[in-house]
């Protein structure tokens, strides 16, 4: 049992398509930079929303996402309207992180964050996204503060 607790504390399993499915090793944070995969604890309202919607199992209380923007590249965050798709797309630099929806995959209302509120205002705020089109990420729950980030994560076993 003791060994299991040590393993559980140092690893996590990604079971949604926000990132590649698999087992991720958790590492202490020395610094946080764009491109890092991080484990974080969303605020209570976000956790309750996620659980009420069934986006994650009831036992989950942390999320894992990629850091795609910080204070240094905040001006690269933009929303571009795609006339073919008739959707707003979220870009950071030249990378398209996909549509911003007003309904989730089950047709329920979902409220995206405004462009202004997606841009970090100081060095302790980060935009965390996934390029998976159904991801529930910062475009809906907002920026994540450094205090909420628990660990860095790297995939060790891909499913």
Give short role names for the model-derived ranges.
Residues 1-7:
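Hydrophobic membrane-insertion alpha-helices, especially the h-region
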Residues 8-159:
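Soluble "head" domains of membrane/secretory-pathway proteins
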């Amino acid at each position: 049992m003791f060994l299991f607790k040590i393993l559980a504390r140092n690893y996590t399993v990604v079971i949604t398509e926000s990132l590649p499915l698999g087992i991720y090793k958790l590492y202490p944070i020395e610094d946080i930079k764009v491109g890092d995969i991080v484990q974080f604890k969303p605020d209570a309202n976000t956790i309750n929303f996620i659980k009420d919607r069934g986006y994650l199992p009831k036992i989950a209380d942390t999320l894992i996402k990629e850091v795609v923007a910080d204070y240094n590249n905040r001006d690269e965050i933009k929303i571009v309207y795609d006339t073919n798709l008739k959707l707003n797309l979220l870009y950071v630099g030249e990378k398209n992180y996909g549509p911003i929806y007003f309904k989730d995959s089950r047709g329920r209302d979902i409220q995206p964050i405004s462009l202004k509120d997606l841009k970090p205002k100081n060095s302790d705020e980060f935009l965390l996204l996934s390029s998976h089109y159904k991801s529930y990420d910062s475009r809906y729950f907002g920026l994540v503060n450094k205090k909420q980030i628990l660990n860095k994560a790297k995939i060790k076993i891909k499913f």
